[in-house]
Amino acid sequence: MSITKVHARTVYDSRGNPTVEVEITTENGLFRAIVPSGASTGIHEAVELRDGNKSEWMGKGVTKAVSNVNSIIGPALIKSELCVTNQKGIDELMISLDGTSNKSRLGANAILGVSLCVARAAAAQKGITLYKYIAELADARQDPFVIPVPFFNVLNGGAHAGGSLAMQEFKIAPVGAQSFAEAMRMGSEVYHHLKILAKEQYGPSAGNVGDEGGVAPDIDTAEDALDMIVEAINICGYEGRVKVGIDSAPSVFYKDGKYDLNFKEPNSDPSHWLSPAQLAEYYHSLLKKYPIISLEDPYAEDDWSSWSAFLKTVNVQIIADDLTCTNKTRIARAIEEKCANTLLLKLNQIGTLTESIEAANQAFDAGWGVMISHRSGETEDPFIADLVVGLRCGQIKSGALSRSERLAKYNELLRIEEELGDDCIYAGHRFHDGNKL
């Protein structure tokens, strides 16, 4: 069944910035998708096309991307008469229309919106759920489906919050839960106790939340953040059942080959900046002291040698985000140079569903894990909930249990788990090997 109408418009993300919403129409009805955006974006990501007109939306308008859907992509898809179940063919047509290596002509935000709509339309045509359709596209097992461990970003720093804290995300992971529903309850309880502790220790404003729903107290160090998180876990009685993850996002504080943990200070002293080896020592001290099971982006996006050296010294999950940008060329290099053992997959880093699935399978084939991720500028679209189940990734991060654009994904996973019943398992301690369960 081919597409009869394509329409895009400007809507708004969770930060109040414009983003692209796309609708396609087939004989089965209308299907919609909204594209997210990032704050700490990697320089190697596919291009999110913004207008750049400072007199409107402070330069963040997406009218060019919207116009590209309505005047270029839409007419070409309708003319092609490609069936909506031909996901690869449609995605390749859009890539060809763009004609650049990073989707800078039409915009990854334009292309991705259409790509996700097409998948929803195809699932409807086949009469199956979106996650089952994605599993078919990826040639992933469906017996049983795997429900992911949620990595809740409960404390925000870095580019996602004010305060002095350099590292961007401090996450909790209920690996000891027996189901996703129980993981949500455990995460909720720890989050609320953390909020109480933050207010007690740093004042009422410490309960204010960052872009991803985590508390954002004005704290200085990772130790301060981790001490408070571990205390909240222990208050709830979940010691050993709820673990911790960190996303350093250090590309924003990488300067002249060193890492400035005081980068938010206007007059940061270069003599205090850390060499890659010194930063590794710091990470090791945190790993010894706290129940950390996952480190994301321990080094900057082009500091390849530091990644490789560090991976040899740890036995926890090391996630590549800015390093790889869901880009198959960079993933291949990271695999070859043994830089990480897990891929962070963000749909809008690469710009089509087909390429995202290929990236996941590329990582799986190398023995890596895959974590599906939201963006800091999110929307109410829960597509990644179906994506993580369809790909059997075993782990997802979509912010804290706060802000509806974050909960939209988690609540959809609750529905999927309930719908599947005995036909699914919770990844739990096997979160890194979800595709092997």
UniProtKB/Swiss-Prot annotation:
Key words of the record: Glycolysis, Lyase, Magnesium, Metal-binding
Record's catalysed reaction(s): (2R)-2-phosphoglycerate = phosphoenolpyruvate + H2O
Entry annotation: catalytic residues: E212 (proton donor), K346 (proton acceptor)
CDD domains associated with the record: enolase (cd03313)
Annotated binding of Mg(2+), by residue: D247, E296, D321
PROSITE patterns, per the entry: ENOLASE (PS00164)
Ligand binding (substrate): H160, E169, E296, D321, S373, H374, R375, S376, K397
Required cofactor(s): Mg(2+)
Pathway(s) where this gene product acts: Carbohydrate degradation; glycolysis; pyruvate from D-glyceraldehyde 3-phosphate: step 4/5
InterPro entries: Enolase, Enolase-like_C_sf, Enolase-like_N, Enolase_C, Enolase_CS, Enolase_N
EC code: 4.2.1.11
GO cellular component terms, A-Z: phosphopyruvate hydratase complex
One GO molecular-function entry: magnesium ion binding
GO biological process: glycolytic process
Family of this protein: Belongs to the enolase family.
NCBIfam families: eno
Protein name: Enolase-related protein 1
Organism: Saccharomyces cerevisiae (strain ATCC 204508 / S288c) (Baker's yeast)
Recorded name of the encoding gene: ERR1
